[in-house]
Each structure stands twice: as C-alpha cells, then as structure tokens.
Amino acid sequence: MFIAVLLGAYSHLETYFLRVEKYTIETEKLPKGTEIKIMNASDMHLGPVMREDRVEMVKRVYEREKPDILVATGDTVDGNMKNLDYLAQMLAELNPPLGKFAVLGNHEYYVGLNQSLDFLRKAGFRVLRGEAVEINNFLVIAGVDDSDGKRLGYRVFTDELEVLKNVDTKKYVILLKHKPRIKREAIKYVDLVLSGHTHGGVLFFVGYTILRLIFETDRGIKELAPGKYIIVSKGVGTGGPPMRLLSPPDVVIVTIKGKGN
C-alpha cells in the first residue's frame, strides 16, 4: 500500500519535471553557417485542468532558447476553453522571427473543432491543415490533420503524401503530424517529421513495449531513411489524470545546421 501511494505521488510530481530534449541535424540543403532553431511544444492539453502552469513552462524554455520557429504538433487544446482566452494571450506573446505553426491532434476534435481552431489562432499559430508553406529560401513546413477527425465526422486533411509530393524537395522539408506515423512512399519527400501524441506511453513500459509496435517510436529520434528523421515529443501536458512514470514531459529543440555551398 505504501509503495502504491509513493508511486502515485511521484507520478504526479513527474508531470512538472519538464525536460528540454535537444537535437542537431546537419543538411546540405542549407548553406554552411546557416542555423535554424525549431521548438516543438506538443500536447499541452490546455483546458480546465492544464492551465497557466503549462504555458509558463513553455514560455520559460522559449525565452531561454530563443527559437526561430515555434510549432505545436497537436493536442494543444483539451477541454472547454470558455473563459480561458488568457491562455491564448500568454501564447500570443511568443513571437519567433520565422513564425508559429500548429496542427490538429485528436483532442482538438474531441472537444470541438471550432473552439480549438479559434484558440490556436488567438494564440498566434497558423494552423496547417493539409498544406505546406515556404518559410524562407531554404525551408518548407507542411502539416496535416489528425486522422481521428474523420472518424468523428469532420472534414479532415490527413494525407501527407498528397501534400508532400507537391513541395520543392530542394528545400529542407519538415512535416508536422500529431501521431508519429508516416506513409512509406511519403518519406522521400520529407527531411524531418515532428510529432507528439504518445506521451512516451505515460508509463515508460507502455511506451517501450506497446507504442513502439504501433508508431515509429514512442519518444526521441529515429532515422526513417538515410538523412531523414522523425522526432517524437513526450508532450508538455497530459490528456488524462496528471500522472507520468519515467516518461517526463518535454519540449523539443531541433537545430538545423547547414553544411551546403
């Protein structure tokens, strides 16, 4: 009984132990000496339970790391956002020089698409729904909706292949997709996939056993093909009870370094 109570208490505390997971990727697609820093604040699950403490976690990392781009790979919203516009305003204060981009996760559909889109836009994010945008001379960011929206009867834009096959692959192509899956035939069009959703399984053994069979990985970085990667965040918040065990929350920082001519 004592051990169960101790584990329960620790698993709640762990939800506050935010880690910053840093990765550096080199590419010939950016000129030598060019660096672009991207921050992924995935799975904040903002709503009646996860509130300003989660946004403050994100803001502290943002202010320290000073990313060029801020992305949110789904499940930013998780609940009735009535009277919570101040959370959107807190996020709107973050203004990276190359922009803010988000995609929809499953929870944005569960709690209502319109209020979710409204919140994300008030927070200053451009929501990518089956589209790709050129950021500068070297970078493309694409995003697709989460597939759960279709099951719930929404019109969704989920086909990454349809989006990616039209991008300029001479540029460095990043795909934002909530669940860490990608069609095999789409990999040749993309350089980096940023995802969330898994929470590292919430309990580490769930991630290492079950989720790695379902998704590309439950956390961290995996090479999909030579020079092509997926990076999965364990997320900032939690979608159920605020509990984690050996799967602490994280924010991902990816630095893309050029080594081209």
From Swiss-Prot:
Binds 2 divalent metal cations. Gene3D superfamilies: 3.60.21.10. One of its GO terms (biological process) is lipid A biosynthetic process. A divalent metal cation 2 binds at residues 75, 106, 197. Its cofactor is a divalent metal cation. Keywords: Hydrolase, Metal-binding. Its EC number is 3.1.-.-. One of its GO terms (molecular function) is metal ion binding. CDD domains: MPP_YkuE_C (cd07385). GO terms for cellular component: membrane. It is an enzyme of class 3 (hydrolase). A divalent metal cation 1 binds at residues 43, 45, 75, 199. SUPFAM superfamilies: Metallo-dependent phosphatases. The keyword Repressor does not apply. Signal peptide: none annotated. Belongs to the metallophosphoesterase superfamily. This is Uncharacterized metallophosphoesterase aq_1054. It comes from Aquifex aeolicus (strain VF5).
